């Protein structure tokens, strides 16, 4: 039985966020989060693709950069989020977008999977004289919108990309129960409470100095 892995994890990251002078008001937390979402959400950084920002966990006292003539303030931010990071030699479920006689293109969220016709598990699949891929267990032709189990052979993404491209191998066809369970698990890895109006009161200035001690390499300078 093929073991499945999820490419999605909940984690904590750091970033540096710029706030305009007109955003320095009682809604500072909301403005910080909105600016953070615009900067890092729905795009890749060196850790993977950030699918969702949950909440800001802590932020430093603002710093006015002398070289910045519009008087914007820079904050060091610690935040919780969900990232997508496919790992080589693991198996995930993808949905076929298109296929032809030379390759299969499938997807899972921000993941775009390319499968060459030579990377098919010959124990589970065969190719007929028309070039169609046949599931040996059901004798049915694989077609667009089918769900497949993909073994990840390699990944490719760069900071700022809006997708992650993977090279994969076609392993098997998952059951309906596995598909439902897999996608439900991906959506419910960990329940994280979304921001409440009182969250800003819980971020005390006593903790803000701790963020400034984090090494610069942990910050997302996109």
Please give the residue ranges for each predicted region.
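Single-stranded RNA-binding regions, centering on S1/OB-family and related RNA-binding modules
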Residues: 1-222
């Amino acid at each position: 039985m093929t073991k499945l892995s999820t490419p999605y994890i909940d984690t904590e990251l750091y970033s540096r966020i710029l706030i305009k002078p007109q955003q320095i008001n009682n809604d500072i937390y909301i403005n910080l989060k909105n600016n953070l979402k615009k900067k890092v959400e729905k795009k890749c950084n060196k850790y993977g693709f950030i699918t969702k920002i949950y909440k800001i966990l802590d932020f430093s006292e603002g710093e006015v950069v002398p070289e910045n003539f519009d008087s914007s303030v820079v904050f060091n931010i610690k935040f919780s989020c969900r990232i997508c990071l496919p790992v080589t030699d693991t198996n995930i479920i993808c949905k076929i977008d298109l296929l032809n006689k030379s390759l299969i293109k499938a997807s899972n969220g921000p993941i775009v999977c390319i499968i060459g016709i030579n990377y098919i598990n010959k124990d589970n699949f065969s190719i007929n004289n028309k070039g169609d891929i046949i599931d040996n267990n059901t004798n049915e032709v694989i077609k667009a919108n089918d769900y497949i189990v993909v073994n990840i052979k390699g990944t490719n993404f760069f900071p700022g990309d809006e997708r992650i491209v993977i090279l994969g191998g076609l392993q098997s066809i998952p059951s309906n129960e596995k598909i439902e369970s897999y996608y439900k698990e991906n959506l419910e890895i960990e329940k994280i409470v979304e921001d409440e109006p009182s969250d800003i009161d819980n971020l005390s200035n006593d903790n803000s100095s701790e963020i400034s001690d984090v090494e610069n390499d942990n910050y997302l300078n996109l």
